[in-house]
Regions:
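A short, basic/flexible loop-to-alpha-helix module at the beginning of a structural domain
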Residues: 1-9
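Structural signature of beta-strand start/N-cap positions in the alpha/beta core
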Residues: 16, 40, 64-66, 91-93
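Conserved glycine-rich Rossmann-like NAD(P)H-binding loop of the short-chain dehydrogenase/reductase
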Residues: 37-54
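Canonical Rossmann dinucleotide-binding motif of NAD(H)/NADP(H)-dependent dehydrogenases/reductases
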Residues: 8-42
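Rossmann-fold scaffold of SDR-type NAD(P)-dependent oxidoreductases
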Residues: 20, 92-100
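Conserved amphipathic alpha-helix within the SDR
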Residues: 55, 59, 65-69, 74-90
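Generic hydrophobic, amphipathic alpha-helix propensity
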Residues: 12, 26, 51-54, 58
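Amphipathic, non-transmembrane alpha-helical secondary structure
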Residues: 28, 32, 36, 52, ...
Length: 102
């Protein structure tokens, strides 16, 4: 995906965006698009390897992304993720809750 392929343009330069459920199809595409707009992206997913795959793709394309394992039903895990995001990317500007369950 390239910036010219996006159906929208928005300046997210240096904004920190956190996306839960980022290892899935929809949120991983969203993460890539947001990174192309200049955001630093934290990809959270229950399966770390899924989030890491997409974070690696974003970083390989010149973006800035980190992957973190998180179960959104566990507050302590989310608090740990928040601290890591602050440490690596800075304060969160945008949160996209894409994690779901059944």
């Amino acid at each position: 995906m390239e910036k010219k392929d996006l159906p929208f343009t928005i300046d997210l330069k240096d904004k920190v965006v956190v996306i839960t459920g980022a290892g899935g199809v929809i949120c991983s595409c969203l993460a890539k698009a947001i990174a192309l707009c200049g955001a630093k992206v934290a990809l959270l997913d229950y399966k770390l390897e899924n989030a890491q795959k997409f974070a690696d793709e974003i970083n390989a394309d010149g973006g800035k992304a980190i992957a973190l394992q998180a179960n959104v039903l566990k507050k302590d895990m989310l608090e740990e993720c928040h601290q890591e995001i602050l440490k690596q990317l800075g304060p969160v500007d945008i949160l996209i809750n894409g994690a779901g369950g059944n």
